[in-house]
Amino acid sequence: MAPPHPRDPSTAANYEQVTVSHYALKWKVDFEKKHIAGDVSITLDVKQDTERIVLDTRDLSVQSVALNLNGEPKKAGFTLEDNQALGQKLVITTESLKSGDRPVLEIKYESSNNAAALQFLTAEQTTDRVAPYLFSQCQAINARSIVPCMDTPSVKSTYEAEVCVPIGLTCLMSAIGQGSTPSECGKRTIFSFKQPVSIPSYLLAIVVGHLERKEISERCAVWAEPSQAEASFYEFAETEKILKVAEDVAGPYVWGRYDLVVLPATFPFGGMENPCLTFITPTLLAGDRSLVNVIAHEISHSWTGNLVTNFSWEHFWLNEGFTVFLERKIHGKMYGELERQFESESGYEEALVRTVNDVFGPDHEYTKLVQNLGNADPDDAFSSVPYEKGSALLFTIEQALGDNSRFEQFLRDYIQKYAYKTVSTEEWKEYLYDSFTDKKVILDNIDWNLWLHKAGLPPKPKYDSTPMQACKDLAAKWTTEGSEAPTDGEVFAKMSNSQKLAVLDAVRVNKTMFGDRMPALTATYKLDQAKNAELKFSWLMLGLETKWSPIVDASLAFALAVGRMKYCKPIYRSLFGWSATRDRAISQFKANIPNMHPITVKAIQSLLK
């Protein structure tokens, strides 16, 4: 029997005594003050007798707290106590609450004008330069900066919301829209939402902006600023097709709608799996649908992450490792098993190896699958490790068991068993053993301690390396001493985007043998003209790593234009580490801080410590 979940270290909430079943939000979005003001009614379930309720906050101004136990709200005393990197604890003293009580907390408050979850953009900072824009990013522990809450994945709740925004703007949330009405003053619009499926706090999300909607199917649409609407519709036209394949792999889709919204370039991630409304970076708008693998990833989160959720951020791999594995299962069904094998090997070699060896170092705590976060902000540990090391473990297990269809059925059963719940690594492992009692000897041969609790690289799974070898062979023509570099770019041009990336990665791995061939590589493969952001990023990184001075201006411009941390953090790391570019890069970064997302600012500032 798996042990009870240990306490989530990233929250101060007393969720062992009291839990939240529902949030009812009434918000007013103020673009001038750059904050959200309003109130929240929090329905509680008391599990153990208590005389206090503890919620997470960060930089909130709390005006009043009332507790409604028997239909009559009574003013409650409260204090805000510092909780270091985790914000402030809102400690509410109550009359004696008994197990089984269902009181409602009523809190009036407002966010600060630098809430960690929010980015307010002026009209000039948006793509169309027509109207201001707001979007949120609550993962991992930033929901507490826009609502007092139990900000832990261990607590799942439904929510409803009424959001008042300036007239002419559209509001979207991670919920099902219930329509809109004009405000009494006629200058604002009130949008209503309901999320009937219980979700963790990090999946609370809001967007407000000048947006246009394009229908993809009965349950899928894409939202974007009008100038990007057609391009977004073209890029993501296969969303319904991907969703249907995902249902074949993982089971029924329970969220009603699957909409996408293309955010401004400052959005710090590739995508964010907010229920009913996936947030997407505009860097995916390649014009040829070559980066829609991110959509398969975010769709997969509808089962692993959103439906079955890691109980704490120390077990983040249960969200992301499973989701990467499902994403590649979907691609295997759509494009063939060889493509799944290739993507899996690419993830191991291009992302995991580099993160472990070059970013953290092989002995670092954050290269473990199950991590000890202590009082650290979980964002500090964010990397490709839970994604790729987690996926590699599942690939290894599937391979060892030798029955892909049975392992796929296990995944569906696992999702069904833990749907609407949270799960620990020990619970998952116990369920794995219970599902394969006839394969215990095989499972026992897996070095669980090495995979789950040891730092560094795990053993590389046995992939079919046929497509990868073709990429390495082409790269070797650029990096083998005495070889003649290719002058014909046709072979490269005919490759898929993921194969092109593998070629450049293989060159980067062997860059010491690359010599002064950067100008020739750039010209032969027309890399300076790349519209695909992944390809352009790999080219820029190769140029920086080989200290090719003509790449500097393009690298600085890319880091300035793109807020996605996957790109700008490594670019700034390289620029900061090169004496010839350090001062210029620091100057650009500091000057651009007002235009950047706070999550991105914090991540890049950490490189300067």
UniProtKB/Swiss-Prot annotation:
Any single Pfam family the record assigns to this protein: Peptidase_M1_N
UniProt-listed PANTHER family: LEUKOTRIENE A-4 HYDROLASE
Substrates-to-products reaction catalysed: Release of N-terminal Arg and Lys from oligopeptides when P1' is not Pro. Also acts on arylamides of Arg and Lys
Role of this protein: Aminopeptidase which preferentially removes N-terminal Arg and Lys residues from peptides and proteins.
GO cellular component: a single term: cytosol
Active-site residues from the entry: E298 (proton acceptor), Y387 (proton donor)
Residues annotated to bind Zn(2+): H297, H301, E320
InterPro entries linked: Aminopeptidase_N-like_N, Aminopeptidase_N-like_N_sf, ARM-type_fold, LTA4H_cat, M1_LTA-4_hydro/amino_C_sf, M1_LTA4H, Peptidase_M1, Peptidase_M1_C
Binding site for substrate: Q137, C138, Q139, P268, F269, G270, G271, M272, E273, R564, M565, K566
Keywords: Aminopeptidase, Cytoplasm, Hydrolase, Metal-binding, Metalloprotease, Protease, Zinc
Protein name: Aminopeptidase ltah-1.1
Family statement: Belongs to the peptidase M1 family.
Cofactor note: Binds 1 zinc ion per subunit.
PROSITE patterns: ZINC_PROTEASE
Superkingdom of origin: Eukaryota
Cofactor(s), by name: Zn(2+)
Entry's Gene Ontology BP terms: peptide catabolic process; proteolysis
EC number of this enzyme: 3.4.11.6
Family matches, as Gene3D superfamilies: 3.30.2010.30, Neutral Protease Domain 2 (1.10.390.10), Peptidase M1, leukotriene A4 hydrolase/aminopeptidase C-terminal domain (1.25.40.320), tricorn interacting facor f3 domain (2.60.40.1730)
Misc remark: Despite its similarity to leukotriene hydrolases, AP-1 does not have leukotriene hydrolase activity. One of the mammalian leukotriene binding sites, 'Tyr-378', is replaced by a Phe residue in AP-1.
Subcellular localization(s) per the UniProt record: Cytoplasm
Gene Ontology terms for molecular function: aminopeptidase activity; epoxide hydrolase activity; metallopeptidase activity; zinc ion binding
